[in-house]
């Protein structure tokens, strides 16, 4: 048998996450793992199991998910990238397929991961091309969010940022980066002679006058708990909206209780950006 590693990109909007779901009471929902295994099994003529580096949730995207699979030696030299992409739906794409040592494991060999969460600083209007990939939050206090983010750096017990439904051994993780950056160009508001914003639209007009751009938050760690990034993002947005002071973060970490932290951020703003080996 030969072990192959895949780099996979996908738009999670219409996918039920990475992992095949164990259910027999209803039709299996569409998953990334399921779509890839469907094609691999058709080529090999026998069941093929893929192992992903991260189990992204329903609605979460990926730019560079990594997975591995074992195939018969006589199938190892096929043009697997072309074969996958010829049969995959348009929301999943294989960027690369390479042969790796037999002992390589996409999940257990990973030293860390980087996720990006995108925010759109306006709630009344979102460009259609951004709507599936960014949380429209409205204007936020970025300085307060920066101050709160600083408390998340380093080794901590992140039990307050873990959702239920996992059997992990420890909730201690080391976060090496929580930082924001702007992406893309600001949409241009046409300068219309004598134009005045209508009632209720002043916030949008003022925001566009200042230049609207996507705010991307990068989270890097040696590993993440279930929905940990979305829960940290939910905290930072709550701080940005003035619902919590930045210095509330240490107490939330110390509590080790999910109920002490704000609500989970929506799935659609999150993208798995990179797996580190």
UniProtKB/Swiss-Prot annotation:
Residues recorded as binding substrate, renumbered to this chain, are 115
Q: Which GO terms describe its molecular function?
A: RNA binding; tRNA pseudouridine(38-40) synthase activity
Q: Which GO terms describe its biological process?
A: tRNA pseudouridine synthesis
Q: What is its EC number?
A: 5.4.99.12
Question: Keywords, A to Z?
Answer: Isomerase, tRNA processing
What does the record give as the active site? 57 (nucleophile)
**Catalytic reaction list:** uridine(38/39/40) in tRNA = pseudouridine(38/39/40) in tRNA
N-terminal signal peptide: none
Spans through the membrane: none
Stored InterPro entries: PsdUridine_synth_cat_dom_sf, PsdUridine_synth_TruA, PsdUridine_synth_TruA_a/b_dom, PsdUridine_synth_TruA_C, TruA/RsuA/RluB/E/F_N
Cite the record's note on assembly.
Answer: Homodimer.
Q: Which family does it belong to?
A: Belongs to the tRNA pseudouridine synthase TruA family.
Role: Formation of pseudouridine at positions 38, 39 and 40 in the anticodon stem and loop of transfer RNAs.
Q: What is this protein called?
A: tRNA pseudouridine synthase A
What's the source species for this entry? Answer: Nitratidesulfovibrio vulgaris (strain DSM 19637 / Miyazaki F)
Lineage in the entry? Bacteria, Pseudomonadati, Thermodesulfobacteriota, Desulfovibrionia, Desulfovibrionales
């Amino acid at each position: 048998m030969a072990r192959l590693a895949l780099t996979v990109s996908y738009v999670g909007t219409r996918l039920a996450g990475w992992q095949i779901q164990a259910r027999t009471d209803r039709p299996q929902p569409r998953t990334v793992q399921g779509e890839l295994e469907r094609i691999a099994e058709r080529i090999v003529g026998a069941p093929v199991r893929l192992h992903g580096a991260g189990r992204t949730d329903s609605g979460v995207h990926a730019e560079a998910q990594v997975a591995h699979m074992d195939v018969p030696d006589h199938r190892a030299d096929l043009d697997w990238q072309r074969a996958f992409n010829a049969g995959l739906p348009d929301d999943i794409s294989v960027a690369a397929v390479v042969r790796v040592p037999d002992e390589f494991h996409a999940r257990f060999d990973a030293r860390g991961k980087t996720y990006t969460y995108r925010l759109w600083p306006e709630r009344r209007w979102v460009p259609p091309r951004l709507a599936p990939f960014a949380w429209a939050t409205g204007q936020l206090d970025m300085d307060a969010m920066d101050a709160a983010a600083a408390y998340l750096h380093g080794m901590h017990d992140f039990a307050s940022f873990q959702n239920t439904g996992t059997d992990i051994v420890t909730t201690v993780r080391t976060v090496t980066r929580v930082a924001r950056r702007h992406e893309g160009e600001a949409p241009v508001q046409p300068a219309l002679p004598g134009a005045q914003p209508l009632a209720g639209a002043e916030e949008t007009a003022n925001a566009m006058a200042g230049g609207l751009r996507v705010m991307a938050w990068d989270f890097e760690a040696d590993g993440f708990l279930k929905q940990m990034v979305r829960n940290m993002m939910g905290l930072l947005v709550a701080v940005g909206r003035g619902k919590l002071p930045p210095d509330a973060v240490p107490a939330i970490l110390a509590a080790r209780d999910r109920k002490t932290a704000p609500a989970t951020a929506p799935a659609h703003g999150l993208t798995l950006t990179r797996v580190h080996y």
